[in-house]
């Protein structure tokens, strides 16, 4: 009987300790998410106002920490020369990071870069692969773009793209 009381006491203490840890972890996550949202919102507000230098300053740390939305937005800035000198290779870098995390718009832009040879060697196989992935991720334009591209590809290239996708 004494063992059961001791076990109940230990269990309550362990549960209490676990709840405290979970509460602290939740607070940490919420505070980080709040800080992310504030920084991202500052960048978005700046971008909408045409202040792309500030947008870059707000989004770059988020992008470097792995945020796919910020990575995509940095890709757009470099792709279009907004707040930075236009740099297609840098745009491809950021699109690739976001695309690998499933960001359909980044996948679509990356496919376009491969199709046109912007920032990368022109490669219809990789353009096909990325438009295929973007279509699977929900991009409405990707399938149409891929269908247009297929008309310019050999049967061997189409087969290779399908095998690699």
Predicted regions and their residues:
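Short helix-capping/linker turns of helical repeat alpha-solenoids
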Residues: 50-51, 64-67, 80-82, 87, ...
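Bacterial N-terminal signal peptides that target proteins for export
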Residues: 6-23
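Terminal, low-structured helical/coil segments at or just beyond the last alpha-helical repeat
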Residues: 141-165
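Sec/Tat signal peptide C-region and signal peptidase I cleavage site
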Residues: 33-37
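Hydrophobic face of amphipathic alpha-helices that form TPR/SEL1-like repeat modules
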Residues: 39-46, 58-62, 73-80, 109-116, ...
